Amino acid sequence: MYTIGQVSEMFDIPVSTLRYYDKEGLFPNLERAGNIRRFGENELELLRIIECLKKTGLEIKDIKRFVDMVQEGPSTYAERRQLFEARKERTEQEIARLQRALAMVKFKCWYYETAQKDGGEERLAKIIPDGL
């Protein structure tokens, strides 16, 4: 079992964020010893999933719905799969967008390195299509 401070350090997540998650019901089976939250392996695994879903842009209310589905059991497998399929598609689209941006950044690095070596952009203007 881990304290909220230990979990905060392990995941590099502020204690206030963990408290917020708890307040929002994202840790339905979180044990308490008095006023001290005790995180077990199940909560750590759930936190990994929560952070993953957050990184894909899912809102807390929708993450809460996922947590509720897990609590409901196997009857929600199809809905959970659908959630992750949608997250996968969104993440793949975001990766593609970032890859295009990275390609442009790499091109501009090359472009300005070449312009610097050449002492200007004249040669580049002749070999590169308009619009770049």
Q: Where are the model-predicted features located?
A:
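C-terminal regulatory/oligomerization modules of transcriptional regulators
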Residues: 75-132
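Basic helix-turn-helix/winged-helix DNA-binding cores
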Residues: 1-67
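Amphipathic alpha-helical dimerization/coiled-coil segments
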Residues: 55-87
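A generic structural signal for solvent-exposed, polar alpha-helical segments
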Residues: 8, 26-27, 45, 72, ...
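Alpha-helical structural elements
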Residues: 15-16, 34, 61, 72, ...
